[in-house]
Amino acid sequence: MVGSMENPGSWGLACLLISTSRFNRYMPYYTMMAAVWSTLIAGALKLQEDPASLSVEYILFKAGLCFVHCLLLCGAGNTWNDLIDRDIDARVERTKMRPLASGKVSTVEALVWMVGQYFLSVKMLDLILDNRSIWGLMLPLTASIMLYPYLKRPVFSRVFIYPQYILGLAVAYPSITGWASINGQEQSMSEIFTHCTPICLLIFFWCLYFNTAYSHQDSVDDRKMNINSAYVVAGQRIRLFLAFLGALPLAVIPYVVLKINSPWLWFSWMAVWTVSIVMQIVRFDSKKLESGGRIHWDNFLLGLWTTVACIVEVGLQKVEFWNLI
């Protein structure tokens, strides 16, 4: 369906386009977490070395720019996904009323909306990196976003390539942007990549875990249409598979926290994440498809908690709290 079923009016069209970007739902806000966490951790590390080197306001400003950049890029990516998958979405119960799948938004309208969001995200990245070359960061991320919907096709399952791989990469990659927003003038790109590797792996594994649980909601319709997704690896052992995936980010967290070695981060990351993920696996019921959506939501709350924890750590480093006790 590529044409509008009816003219919704300017306000109605705006609401539909916002829905196409998912800005009216919590999902896009996952994509800001890698960049924001990386910005805050990089800022906290710099304050640990020299509390006078940066202001808290500057670090939060950079984190805010990263948030807007990632949100806009995610909106463009979601619009692209719905453009490519509109015929598939029309046959899946959970997605059949999406604006493109239902014909309420035309292909041309969606394309214009997508390009506008992408352009604004590029301009925002230019601000974040203080007019440095941005395409070295932007092009790999753009390629992964464009590739993502095609990996749902069954041909990729034959070589064990699943869309969650690319989604995890796309969500994790902006951690490089976040680190560069603080250290871009002082560190080479190879140094930035090295510093960001632990947090990139953490976000990648985390995304693989919660998105596999989320996509399991559509398993009945997906099997009918032979849609490729990571949960097919597990078969009937989906709980065991999710437990394995949930253990992967927990294994990486120490390498992230050790950079600062803050007691607060050890508690707010390692302890809270461990309890949360264990509880999620215990509550998961493979016979109730909606329980995968509950895991997705629980991890969003976990991500918000981690963002707040990182902001608190920036404040603790600024006042040299750990030197006072």
Curated annotation (Swiss-Prot):
InterPro entries: Prenyltransferase, UbiA_prenyltransferase, UbiA_prenylTrfase_CS, UbiA_sf. Its EC number is 2.5.1.-. Disruption phenotype: Results in dramatic reduction in MPA production and leads to the accumulation of DHMP. One of its GO terms (biological process) is terpenoid biosynthetic process. Pathway: Secondary metabolite biosynthesis; terpenoid biosynthesis. It comes from Penicillium roqueforti (strain FM164). Its cofactor is Mg(2+). This is Polyprenyl transferase mpaA. The chain crosses the membrane at residues 27-47, 56-76, 108-128, 134-151, 159-179, 192-212, 240-260, 262-282, 295-315. The keyword Ribonucleoprotein does not apply. It comes from the Eukaryota. The keyword Acetylation does not apply. GO terms for cellular component: Golgi apparatus; Golgi membrane; plasma membrane. It is found in: Golgi apparatus membrane. Polyprenyl transferase; part of the gene cluster that mediates the biosynthesis of mycophenolic acid (MPA), the first isolated antibiotic natural product in the world obtained from a culture of Penicillium brevicompactum in 1893. MpaA is a Golgi apparatus-associated enzyme that catalyzes the prenylation of 5,7-dihydroxy-4,6-dimethylphthalide (DHMP) to yield farnesyl-DHMP (FDHMP). The first step of the pathway is the synthesis of 5-methylorsellinic acid (5MOA) by the cytosolic polyketide synthase mpaC. It holds the Pfam family UbiA. Keywords: Glycoprotein, Golgi apparatus, Membrane, Transferase, Transmembrane, Transmembrane helix. Belongs to the UbiA prenyltransferase family. It is an enzyme of class 2 (transferase). The gene is mpaA. Its main location: Golgi. PROSITE patterns: UBIA (PS00943). It catalyses: 5,7-dihydroxy-4-methylphthalide + (2E,6E)-farnesyl diphosphate = 4-farnesyl-3,5-dihydroxy-6-methylphthalide + diphosphate.
